Every structure is written in structure tokens, then in C-alpha cells.
Amino acid sequence: MSNIKTQDVPRVGFVSLGCPKATSDSEHILTRLRAEGYEISGSYDAADLVVVNTCGFIDAAVEESLDAIGEALAENGRVIVTGCLGAKDDVILAAHPQVLAVTGPHATEEVMQAVHRHLPKPHDPFSDLVPPQGIRLTPQHYAYLKISEGCNHRCTFCIIPSMRGDLVSRPIHDVMREAEALADAGVKELLVISQDTSAYGVDVKYRTGFWGGKPVKTRLYDLANALGELGIWIRMHYVYPYPSVDDLIPLMAEGKILPYLDVPFQHASPRILKAMKRPANAENVLERVRKWREICPDLTIRSTFITGFPGETEEDFEQLLQFLEAAQLDRVGAFAYSPVEGAAANDLPDAVPDEVREERRARLMDFQEDISTQRLEAKIGREMTVLVDDVDEEGALARSPGDAPEIDGLVVIPDGEGLAPGDFVRVRITDCDIHDLYAERVV
């Protein structure tokens, strides 16, 4: 029995879960759907079928994804599953055997083939159905720019390489073409993402490509330099702490890209870093952070850490707190270790009890709160350019160069008259709390 609706134009519903890399995958699939003449439905009822892009990184994400698939099946009945959890099709089919198809992550072609099988595409689609910048799930003034897929590292807590494969860098001319189209469409900020941003080009031995009639190496420094010519904000995420990252700091000091680094250090104890297979040394990191700030005093550093990793002792955790005190990071996120099916860390000895993992996470965040607040307080009295995200009757919400969307703080501007999302505005910082800055407009 078919549940296909009787409307003339086929409609596809879409549910996107997970990280910014998954969001980028969703945007590529949505762009293909629109290019082929499908309409995107905002409701289950109006859709002929539903695509669910899943996350499978931790147990909570698996549960959320399975729940989303179940909801789509209950409300619509015709569901195609893609994304990271799709790499474990046995898990999906055991829970929901009635799904139409399952693909892994970064699988636009496979998703489109499944859509074609179950919902034939309309005749004579027109390319002008799709804007040059493609279909996006983010607000109009910022966008994610994915530069590679997969990862060559084998961190013991992570299963991404088993789901997304080894590093595959996008050709630099493809990345720049997408970036230019986004800038031309009015995007004011590009957030550069991948599993391992600083490894860009390693897999192709930094092959030389061409952009704007000039040779450009497939390398993060060269890409950042080229992106900096677009005249919009460029923000770097998921930067593995390679020595080559040092080359980006002068570009930040010159104002070519934002003075912002999202570097997932994960821990500071040499013993735990070794167990994680993370090739970092806390003393070396501290020296590099010092040099980065010497070159670019306005640099904002965000990082994430895992507490309660197997084998972590109280001494290891204290080393992590000492690192935070010395590093004076601006923004920090912390996660209590959660076993992930298929991760090598599951086989490590000396598991830390759940309550200790969570207690250490809470202690870390309390400890870091004072540091982050002091870093914000140092900005009071300074003038800076901010990017407006939202405006209502109470004023405007914006972000500084040191604030990425959704994960960092905001700049609250009481006087939002005449402002709109995507506007740049000059402000003076007047106050702060533990997360956000407060500012007045500079006339």
C-alpha cells in the first residue's frame, strides 16, 4: 500500500541532527533535492517521504536519532535514514525495520538514489529553483564551510573514522567557489569546519590548485589567506594542535581571519593523553598559547575536555585544572566520558564511576567559570565590531569576533533601532556576566 500524497510536485520532509558537519551534509542533500525539482516540506503530513540525517557519536545521540526515526515513521510512514548512525544499519533496522533505506554519512548520491527509487523526481527541473549558494539550514548571515571529510587520527574515544573514513580534502577551487557564492549571497561569516581542519591537504600532499587565475596550495594557511580576501568574517573550528597552526596566527593579527581558534585539547595529563592517542604535551601547548597571544593579543581560544576517561585519577584531573589555570582559555566545554559502541577506549582498564565522571565535569566547569569571566571583564571599556544575530523590541543580540554561534556567548545591545540580522555594528563594551557581554552603540 502506498502512502504517496496526490499533489503534483513531490515533497520531501527533512530532519537534521548532530554536529555542524552533519548540518553541512544536510545542506548538500537539500540543495540536490531542490535542484531536481523536489519541494521541501516543513511538516510530516505534507511530505511524500522524510529523510532523517542522524548522529551516532555517543549513546545519547544514538537514542535521539532512533527516536527521531520512530517519530517520522509514526507521523509519515516513509523514511530514508542517512548520517553517522547509518553506518550501523543493523542498529537502525533492528529498531525500525520498516525504513525505506539506510545510508552512511556524507552520502548525498546514495540518498538521492533512494529518493529516486521511492519518489521519482519531477520532469524538467529548472536550475533556477536553487540559489547559487545552495540550500542552507543556518540563518542567512552565516554559514558552515566544510573543507574535508573523515579523519586520519585514531583517538580511542572516537568512532568517527569508522563512520566517515580517512581524511579526504575537498579541492581548494571547490571550497573557494562555494565560499565566494556564499559571500555573494550576503553571508557575513563563514565557519570553517571538518573532522580535522588543520590536516587540510595532507591526503593530497598539499597539491597545488588554482583560484582566481593564481596557484593556491591545498593547505590550511593558503586556504585561510584566500578566504580572507572575501572581506567577511572567517572563523576556524576543530583545529587539531599541529605546529602548522602557528602559521595562522599572523593572519589573525593582520585581520584577515578572525582571532579565534577552536582547539579540542581534550586533556592535559600526559598519561591520559597517551591513553586517548592524542599527540599533545601540556607544557608545549602552554608555550604555544603564550606565543600565539604574544603575536595576536586579541586571540580567543575555545577548547573541549573529557573528564572521567578510563584510568583518570584525581592526580590526572588536578593536572587538567592546573593546565586550565595556566592556559587561561577564553571558552571551555566539558563532557563526562561516555562509552561509545565500537570505541577502543571501551577496552581500557580502570573505568571511572559515572558519578565521579560527572562530579569532575562539574568541578572543571566551576573552575573555568572564574577564568572565563575574568577574560570577559578585561574587555569592558573596549570598542569592537560585532555581528548582529537577532533584533526585537528589547534590543539586539550580536556576537563579537570571540563568539561563535550557538556555542559561545552573545553581545547584548539595548538599542537595536535600525539594526537587522547580518549587520556589522561598532560598540563599546560596558559590562559582562559569566557568559555574555553588554554594549552600547558607538555613534
UniProtKB/Swiss-Prot annotation:
The UniProt entry, under Pfam families, shows: Radical_SAM (PF04055), TRAM_2 (PF18693), UPF0004 (PF00919)
Q: What SMART domains does the entry give?
A: Elp3 (SM00729)
Positions that bind [4Fe-4S] cluster 1 = 19, 55, 84
Catalytic activity line of the entry? L-aspartate(89)-[ribosomal protein uS12]-hydrogen + (sulfur carrier)-SH + AH2 + 2 S-adenosyl-L-methionine = 3-methylsulfanyl-L-aspartate(89)-[ribosomal protein uS12]-hydrogen + (sulfur carrier)-H + 5'-deoxyadenosine + L-methionine + A + S-adenosyl-L-homocysteine + 2 H(+)
Q: Where is the Radical SAM core domain?
A: 137-375
Q: What does this protein do?
A: Catalyzes the methylthiolation of an aspartic acid residue of ribosomal protein uS12.
**Can you name this protein?**
Ribosomal protein uS12 methylthiotransferase RimO
Record organism: Azoarcus sp. (strain BH72)
Q: Which gene encodes it?
A: rimO
